[in-house]
Amino acid sequence: MSTPHINANPGDFAKTIIMSGDPLRAKLIAETYLEDVKEVTNVRGILGFTGKYKSKDISIMGHGMGAPSASIYFHELMATYGVKNFIRVGSCGAISDNIHLKDLIVAMGASTDSKINRIRFLDHDLAAIANYDLLQACIEVLKTTTVNYKVGNVFSSDLFYRPNENDYTLMAKYGVLGVEMEVNALYALAAEHQCRALALCTVTDHIVQHEHLTADERRTDLHEMVKVALETAIKI
């Protein structure tokens, strides 16, 4: 049975999915790393695929930009298609002096300026946190690599172009490592639907220091994150 935004058939999705904001990146990941790949959904250009990685069924799918868009796909995958394990791979802007370009942030929790979780949670603040089993599995994988990584909190913003950059000073004071747009929604929906979720963010920009990766560097270093996500996926 399809949903308004996903036209896959029952059973088309694996229990574990890796999600990216960019549907073309999802397509690239699927075609590069999976065997026996099948496209399972393509509504509104949001592409989803299922295949095998080291003999384990894995799905890859896009979700668009921002919490409202991403929440549609997270919800439908959880509520209708029975997907249980979510690993989001994406980029972020660093705000901490201890974080550098190309570092990988493993998002332990997500603060936000969005009201999306308050709407779900009786206008209370929800602690939007990663699943511990996924987090632990990811750290085990990272310890076998040369990837520079930090584990900590991110800030999920509704604004890509923030009008007051002084906000970042306060966030950094509270230990926030980087800013992105979807993690708080993913972790809240995973809690609501008793699923497991983890987000990985490669630092492609340093907001405070005004540093940016080139297009070629983004392509290469995001692949390192994807490999970590895939190896994490087969450990759970």
UniProtKB/Swiss-Prot annotation:
Family that this chain belongs to: Belongs to the PNP/UDP phosphorylase family.
Residues engaged in binding phosphate: G21, R25, R44, R88, V89, G90, S91
PROSITE patterns: PNP_UDP_1
Residues holding a purine D-ribonucleoside: H5, E180, M181, E182, T204, D205
Assembly information from the UniProt record: Homohexamer; trimer of homodimers.
Gene3D superfamilies in alphabetical order: Nucleoside phosphorylase domain (3.40.50.1580)
EC number: 2.4.2.1
Task performed by this protein: Catalyzes the reversible phosphorolytic breakdown of the N-glycosidic bond in the beta-(deoxy)ribonucleoside molecules, with the formation of the corresponding free purine bases and pentose-1-phosphate.
Record-given protein name: Purine nucleoside phosphorylase DeoD-type 1
Signal sequence, start to end: none
Residues with site note (Important for catalytic activity): R218
NCBIfam families cross-referenced by the UniProt entry: deoD (TIGR00107), PRK05819.1 (NF004489), PRK13374.1 (NF009914)
A GO cellular component annotation in the UniProt record: cytosol
Keywords: Glycosyltransferase, Transferase
Keyword Disulfide bond among UniProt keywords: no
Source organism, top-level taxon: Bacteria
The protein's enzyme class: transferase
GO biological process entries: purine nucleoside catabolic process
GO-annotated molecular function: purine-nucleoside phosphorylase activity
HAMAP family (UniProt xref): Pur_nucleosid_phosp
